[in-house]
Curated annotation (Swiss-Prot):
tRNA processing as UniProt keyword: no
Described function: Binds to the 23S rRNA.
Lineage top rank: taxon: Bacteria
Example GO molecular function: rRNA binding
Region (Disordered): 20-52
Keywords: Ribonucleoprotein, Ribosomal protein, RNA-binding, rRNA-binding
Family: Belongs to the universal ribosomal protein uL15 family.
Origin species: Coxiella burnetii (strain RSA 493 / Nine Mile phase I)
Quaternary data: Part of the 50S ribosomal subunit.
Protein name: Large ribosomal subunit protein uL15
Residue intervals passing through the bilayer: none
SUPFAM superfamilies for the chain: Ribosomal proteins L15p and L18e (SSF52080)
Biased composition (Basic residues): 30-39
């Protein structure tokens, strides 16, 4: 076998169907579009979600819930990320200085993911039970 002998397997590639080319083709005259109506004409189509004038589904179902504004100023930090902080005190300012959280964040919760490799003092931040155990096991404390 040579490179110039390569060809796709039989039946792997289909020829493009040419519509509107006579009744013998099986797709002549209306070219599979049916008779009249919006879908038979060129250029006309409805917008997504339009149901022909009937009240659409997204307007029939009731609204629910809301987006909390606290989400914009809250962040979650992994326990393993505390190793990036140079000092031994972890607070909001030190997390911002180490580029772990953005400047607009005002509420932080630390959750147990990763390993803590040094004793740290966590000040003014919320922590999970797993983090509390891990920090105390590493010789640190939570204030």
């Amino acid at each position: 076998m040579q490179l110039n002998d390569l060809k796709p397997a039989k039946g792997a590639r289909h020829q493009k169907l040419r519509v509107g080319r006579g009744i013998g083709s099986g797709k002549g005259k209306t070219a599979g579009r049916g008779h009249k109506g919006q879908h038979s004409r060129a250029g006309g189509y409805h917008k997504v979600g339009f149901e022909g004038g009937q009240m659409p589904l997204q307007r029939r179902v009731p609204k629910f819930g809301f987006t909390s504004r606290k989400e914009l100023i809250s962040a979650e930090v992994r326990l393993g990320e505390l190793n990036k902080i140079s000092g031994d005190v972890v607070d909001l300012a030190s997390l911002k200085a180490a580029n772990i959280i953005s400047r607009q964040i005002k509420r932080v919760k630390i959750f147990a993911a990763g390993k803590l490799e040094k004793p740290v003092t966590i000040r003014g931040l919320r922590v999970t039970k797993g983090v509390k155990a891990a920090v105390e096991a590493a010789g640190g404390k939570i204030e």
